[in-house]
Amino acid sequence: MKFAFYTLGCKTNQYETQAMEQLLLTQGHTVGRWEEACDGYIINTCSVTAVADKKNRAVIRRCRKQNPDAVIAVCGCYSQHAPEAMDALGVDVVGGSAQRQAFVDMLLECANTRQKQQQLDNALRRREFEVLPAGGLSERTRAMLKVQDGCVNFCSYCIIPYTRGPVRSAPLELAVEQAKALAERGYREIVLTGIEIASWGVDLPGKPALTALVSAICRAVPQCRVRLGSLEPRIITEDFCRELAAFANLCPQFHLSMQSGCDTVLARMKRKYDTARYYESVALLNRFFPGCAITTDMIVAFPGETPEEFQQSLAFIRKCGFADMHIFPYSRRPGTPADQMPNQLGNEVKESRSRAAIAVAEEMSRAFREALVGTVQEVLFEEQEGGYFAGHAPNYVKVYAQGDELHNQIRSVEITSVHLDGVSGRILP
């Protein structure tokens, strides 16, 4: 049978989609594109905000309307959090944010019998890391490797600890073996991902540090680039940077969670750092990885955020000089403390502050990309786009160049100009 996937949300979801693709492929099924006619469609959902939930529902409704006779299966954080919504949306197979093998089994059972299936667990009771096959479709150049799941930070705006459960870490030996398998299959880059990879190891014997895992993987696959998923400021220390700076195949791009550049807002968010500690992390990364790309997320118009607090955030992001940012207006999430906070801000304020923050972010992004002009970057090429081949440099800047079939090749490119959402250059002989 033929199936197609639609993935919303984080890189962990991308990994889990790749794992489910692999489970289907090993059983003799095929994985098609979303727009193709298939026997079943799997939607891997995100529930990080109420806006994400709205997008989930829109994708499910559109899929059901366009494919009235196909099996529609939904998994991920949205179905984990709101399983009661699935029946009204016409979903045939309902899974949560774990038990992917069982979910695939239910999908195949429904495809054969047309009997609806549902299986959910209590996320807060999870204690074991779910081992899944690493991989997916062979035409990809970059593979996700989940090394951790769960979160216990309980930030005031976030529901993910309730949908993903407590921290569970992949044993180091398992992660290394999966990384080797991905390298042997031809992937040129491996992204270490999880819900909060900074917590990797806290539940393992001896509580090993994340650096032990990253170092072991970098040594095991020297032919692959290794990229880190989102990090927390607390983990960026001098020892962390010194140890990882020794690996040439570690990509110098660090997504450092921020959310706000104002200490009083960070306190209301229940984040576990202040701007001084955050900037210390930025300075350490710049010191040990010269020219690295530091990227982040920012929530604007959090409940009670005053104009002065917002201006503090803008000044702070300018100080940090981020290479790229994701800007989100605060979205109320029922069931979280922030949803009950006073002084909820209106859409007009959210929109104006989003525009202001995006303008600063775009200015910084352009400055970072302009600084690359004249440099030579090792680019992993992925696909053709508008007459160019596009790929990513180690710092994750998108690079466009003209050339013949370059898929999954790493080539030296001299950067000549800023172009679209990245830079362009010429491939060196």
Sequence positions of predicted segments:
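Conserved, mostly hydrophobic/aromatic
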Residues: 175, 192, 228, 256, ...
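Short, solvent-exposed loop/turn segments at secondary-structure boundaries
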Residues: 52-54, 166-171, 201-207, 268-271, ...
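Residues at or immediately flanking beta-strands
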Residues: 2, 71, 189, 225-227, ...
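Contiguous mid-protein beta-loop-alpha structural module that forms a pocket-lining wall or clamp
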Residues: 305, 321-322
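Terminal RNA-binding accessory module
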Residues: 340-429
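Acidic, glycine-rich loop-and-beta core segments that form the ion-binding/anion-interacting portion
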Residues: 209-261, 272-279
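Proteins enriched for Cys/Gly/acidic motifs involved in redox and nucleic-acid/cofactor modification
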Residues: 1-200, 215, 239, 244, ...
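Conserved strand-turn element in the central/C-terminal portion of the radical SAM core barrel
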Residues: 154, 158-165, 226-234, 260-270, ...
